[in-house]
């Protein structure tokens, strides 16, 4: 059985000036607790539903014009970790992503991840590789659009 755990909800901010702490939370994943099969990848030996978890954030830094979201596994045995999600150009008016969100319907974009696909790619660590940490980060950005694809 694969040990699939999410143990870190990380938050990084690129905009300075908020009087309050920019905070990321989720109803679907909790630090130090196993992730549900819903958030496991469908493929590469895993048979999850491959849905992104619900995420919400508050106390957005002043001057934020858009957001980016990343999900990263620093414990993947690749030498450089494993990127599970890269979403960007999410409008500043958005402060919550529902489970299984279609980023394009919000006006955002998603980039290629380490599975070789675009969009969210759930957890799927190699068998007998121990626990993995999945770091979800919301980036508050000072520009409306990034010149990325």
Where are these predicted regions, by residue range?
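N-terminus-centered regions that define maturation/targeting leaders and the start
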Residues: 20-149
């Amino acid at each position: 059985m694969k040990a699939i755990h999410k143990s870190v909800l990380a938050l990084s901010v690129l905009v300075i000036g908020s009087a309050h702490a920019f905070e990321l939370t989720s109803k679907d994943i909790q630090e130090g607790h196993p992730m549900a099969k819903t958030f496991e990848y469908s493929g590469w030996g895993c048979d999850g539903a491959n849905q992104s978890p619900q995420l919400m954030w508050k106390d957005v830094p002043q001057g934020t014009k858009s957001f980016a979201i990343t999900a990263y596994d620093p414990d993947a045995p690749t030498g450089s970790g494993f990127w599970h999600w890269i979403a960007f150009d999410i409008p500043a008016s958005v402060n919550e992503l529902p489970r299984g969100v279609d980023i394009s319907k919000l006006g955002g974009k998603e980039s290629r991840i380490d599975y070789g696909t675009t969009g969210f790619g759930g957890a799927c660590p190699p068998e007998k590789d121990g626990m993995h940490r999945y770091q979800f980060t919301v980036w508050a950005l000072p520009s409306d659009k990034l010149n990325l694809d």
